[in-house]
Swiss-Prot record:
Listed NCBIfam families: antidote_HigA
Keywords, sorted A to Z: DNA-binding, Virulence
Record Pfam families: HTH_3 (PF01381)
Residue ranges constituting the HTH cro/C1-type domain according to the UniProt record: 19-74
Protein name: Virulence-associated protein I
Organism: Dichelobacter nodosus (Bacteroides nodosus)
An MF annotation (GO) of this entry: DNA binding
Family, per entry: Belongs to the VapA/VapI family.
PROSITE patterns, per the entry: HTH_CROC1 (PS50943)
InterPro entries (alphabetical): Cro/C1-type_HTH, Lambda_DNA-bd_dom_sf, Toxin_antidote_HigA
DNA-binding region(s), residue ranges: 30-49
Gene: vapI
Amino acid sequence: MSIPAGKNEMPAIHPGEILREEYLKPMGLSAHALAKALHVSPSRINEIVREQRGITADTALRLVRYFGGDAQSWLNMQTAYDLKMAEQDKQSINIIIPLSTDARNVEL
């Protein structure tokens, strides 16, 4: 499920949606079959395709070994999604008082 974006922004897309829609469905592959092929628990893949769990480095490497491609792409998708989700909670971020400009220039 994509998270709606603001004006001129791309929506946040969970990597599980990509896995489900671009890999599993077109190939007629079930989450359970993929889990078996990747030697991981079925719950891991099910949670990813249901967008309830993120892609880890380990999962990215396993997906790339099976499907081909680039592990960094899977991790970048996850990071982009995580950032979009975090940005939606601006209220908790906006209460942080930034370090003053003068203090930022001090070497530690």
